[in-house]
Amino acid sequence: MMTVELNLAVNREAVAERATRLGEPSWMVAKRQDALDLAPTLALPKVEKIKIEGWNFTEGTTELETVTGLSSDIEALIGENRDHMLVTRNGQLVHAQNSEASNGVIFTTLEDALKQHPELVEKYFMTEGVQVNEDRLAALNAALRNGGTFLYVPKGVKLSVPMQAIYTLEQSGAALYHHAIIVADVDSELTYIENFVSYGDEAHSVNVVTEVFVEDNAKVLFGGVDTLSKGAITYMNRRGVVKQGAKLEWALGHMNDGHTVTETKTHLVGNDSFSDTKAVTVGRGEQKQNFNVRTDHFGKGSEGFILIHGVQKDAATSIFNGTSMIHHGASKSNGVQTERVLMLSEKARGDANPILLIDEDDVMAGHAASVGRVDELQLYYLMSRGLSRKEAERLVVHGFLQPVVSELAIDSVKERLVQVIEGKVN
């Protein structure tokens, strides 16, 4: 077993001291320490065709500066309706409102949940979802966590309005380790929308692990729009565990400006379970991004769909890996995926790799992929109608992404994405 030296400013004692100061239970303190010991023995996430070994995933202080209140940027982002809203700045809670508390809904920071509902957190924290030993960055998230969210909807409760969260990092040279747990108990329904935001070109790192549990016959709509700045090195690991007859829909906008590694994986463990992953991205500048989207079929009659469209500008590079794995025993399952990449310049690079892995008979599966440069004839036609090249490219980009954006199940995510896409294209 190879061990690497990590440039961390903390050790076992410091991790335990911080956890104890926060009032965490002994099992969580031990989990933090064990994860810290494990991290140097683990490899970075496996990434195709992009070298991430030199990326600054671990340097940066985990002691985040205290900020209070809602900044003008956050005010503009959340608007007037704040009844079901949680906001953290530098990992610290600055606003929380849960109008569904009377129905038993828990919507709070992970730290508060550890104090008030430790048994629930222990049940779901890195047990069935993301594993501590998956890779080095997952282990570091478990060890160094300095932000997080816990959302739990009880059995039979069906929420009619989205629960929303905004997480900002506003400190250069800082490292945010955020961990979210989203649980829809049996026969419940919820919509959860999150936005990760950071500012400035100064170096900082963001490590996010999100675990979504959809119990029997429950339904979750998960929306995420990430707009981390050019200085952010980002690792984002989102995992869904979907039980019998349950449904999970991902609606994701990967709109960071810095180097990014994302993993969105769904485990369809129950019979007749369902997942649908839709994502769009716009890369620009010299950023490098790697997107791994995977659906694992374990339950009979499970259905999984993946649809990703990406646009690359300037000298940006993005790799899209889509995998549908139908395991032995998952008969009558259906796995379908499509990845499409459009490049707007000679220096832009994109790659789409659809993969089908099938270990069962009596199943359906299909994939499609395309990578290509913008059609100059199409641009010429638009420009002949009086548009500038920039305006023509803008229309082409919106048209290319529209088949995904229009199908997103959450209207507010659609609206937010259109705004962000417009900003990145211009």
Q: For the regions a protein language model found, what residue spans apply to each?
A:
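Short, low-to-moderate order helix/coil transition modules at the start of elongated helical scaffolds
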Residues: 1-209, 216-219
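Conserved beta-strand/loop scaffold segments within soluble protein domains that form the structured core
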Residues: 106, 117, 122-387, 401, ...
